[in-house]
Design a protein with these regions (language model features):
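Intrinsically disordered, low-complexity activation-like regions
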Residues: 2-338
């Protein structure tokens, strides 16, 4: 597993992750809900990328376009999910098991800060990338500290899981959680790369939709995890990017876009239970409005697919003839992108 992670742990992916949140979403190393102004800037910037940036990510996009790479990512996802499924029963009998599971991640995130400073992983970073990696550590450290509820019980859980893992899996428990931590971000970064950058770099071409099935598959696999675990693994903004492939994939059966509706509803419910009203309705991060807007777009995609069986605004790019009903829809909805 370490070998797989090291193969993926190139700093292009980390750069994608942070470039996207810093420059596109206008949220510098923060999982906060974007403001109205941020959204307006995002819609503007998504159409006006600096030529140097487009060129840079275009090369990266082409390099990443190979089946071997996709297969490795797929194996990584499967490993992460199977590991969760095996580990959870060990401490699932406790009433506050999910909180302790989160606390364990907090503990390992804290360990990661020390590992990065002394471990060989840090030594391979070029001088020009050190600030980026420090921001990576800073972002996730602050993220976990903010979103997890701490208890003093993690030591007991840690030793119990450690013994179980090393006896049954024959691998280092420390390495396992270090790997799992990066699994999450590698997967999310790939979803952003294939789902979002493809649409910007290959705008108005068939290529922009080339990886919709791939990103949809990645998101489906992550949704196999318990929704209560996803609360700890992904902030609402990150979760939104997991839902976008479900919106984008043209599925006549409506099963895929329905997953976006269902998963968003479940995530919001668990998020509200975990953080109570103080966080959910706070003025600084009004997650109530955030989930409302995400659900609105989920429903919008669902309604369009249920009505036409496809997205009419892709017809011209895909070389498809539009029906009279579709032409009417396209004419009457100039501000709706789907």
């Amino acid at each position: 597993m370490n070998r797989i992670i090291l193969n993926h742990l190139n700093f292009n992916y980390q750069e994608i992750y942070f470039y996207w949140f810093q420059h596109s979403m206008k949220e510098q190393y923060s999982p906060l809900v974007p403001s109205k102004q941020s959204k307006e800037m995002w819609f503007t910037n998504s159409k006006k990328y600096d030529s140097k940036i487009v060129s840079k990510f275009n090369v990266l996009y082409e390099i990443s376009d190979n089946r071997k790479h996709i297969t490795r990512i797929d194996k990584t996802i499967n490993f992460m999910i199977s590991t969760y499924q095996k580990l959870v029963p060990v401490f699932n009998q406790k009433k506050d098991a999910y909180y302790q599971f989160g606390n364990l991640f907090t503990y390992y995130n804290d360990r990661m800060l020390r590992i990065y400073q002394t471990n060989k992983y840090y030594d391979i970073i070029k001088e020009s990338k050190k600030d980026l990696i420090q921001n990576l550590r800073k972002y996730h450290y602050e993220n976990f500290r903010k979103f997890l509820e701490l208890t003093p019980n993690y030591e007991v859980i840690y030793h119990k899981l450690k013994d179980y893992t090393e006896i049954n899996f024959h691998i280092s428990f420390d390495d396992l959680f270090f790997d799992l931590f990066f699994c999450k971000h590698i997967i999310l970064t790939n979803i952003i790369l294939y789902d979002q950058f493809s649409r910007i770099i290959k705008r108005n071409t068939k290529e922009s939709y080339k990886y919709d099935y791939v990103t949809k598959t990645f998101s489906e696999k992550l949704m196999e995890l318990d929704i209560r675990h996803l609360i700890y693994l992904f902030t609402p903004t990150e979760f939104m990017f997991l839902m976008l492939p479900f919106q984008h994939y043209e599925d006549k059966t409506l099963d895929t876009v329905f997953l976006a509706l269902q998963n968003t509803e479940n995530y919001e419910k668990e998020f509200k239970l975990k953080h109570r009203n103080f966080v959910y309705y706070s003025k600084k991060n009004n997650y109530a409005d955030f989930f409302k807007e995400l659900s609105y777009h989920n429903r919008g995609h669902y309604d369009v697919l249920s009505r036409f069986g496809r997205y009419p605004k892709r017809n011209q790019i895909m070389g498809r003839l539009s029906t009279p009903d579709e032409n009417t829809y396209i004419r009457l909805t100039p501000n709706i992108p789907y």
